């Protein structure tokens, strides 16, 4: 995707032919005749619903029509994260590998990973300079919630030099972008697969309601898309 993931979701939206409502608040799902009523900006009844939302959100929406499944979903915990995107004038000294993962507990390093984007994707390298993405936030810490943008950028530059030897300040920092993801990463504990199986088994008794998402399938676009396709086909 030469212009980012927006190419993917814009193409999917166009190809779907569906009516898509953006910023449409939904407060609850209840029985409505032979279907399900979605309460929000409009009270609308649907034959089938696929919930593609984080587990805690699904728990809130299902508490009336599937309380046991909702209770199971409440056990899925989430982690917050923050991403710092940086563009440098020069890529001299940047390692040739695609990225770096930082072990939990590493001393004097707050970042958990770096993606050396201009090394990983050739079309980004064509733009010149260097593009690097630093990731922060692990389960149980609050960096993504409490750190200022200035702190995140400083840590990203410091940690990048510590981990790779690349001095971003000397390379010429030209652009910065900070994105926070609140509750964006589900925590997969040793009981997680059993939880997913239990939720889906309980929802089998509620004909017309299905569920998908990163908490159920695993993080990453390929895993999420594959699971969503399976769920969608079950409704056909």
Language model segments and positions:
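A conserved beta-strand/loop element that lines the FAD pocket in flavoprotein oxidoreductases
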Residues: 15-27
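A structural signal for the hydrophobic beta-strands that form the central parallel beta-sheet
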Residues: 20-22, 51, 211
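Conserved flavin/dinucleotide-binding core of flavoenzymes
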Residues: 114-236
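Generic solvent-exposed, charged/amphipathic alpha-helical segments
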Residues: 9-14, 63-66, 153-161
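Short beta-strand to alpha-helix junction loop
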Residues: 1-13, 21, 145-152
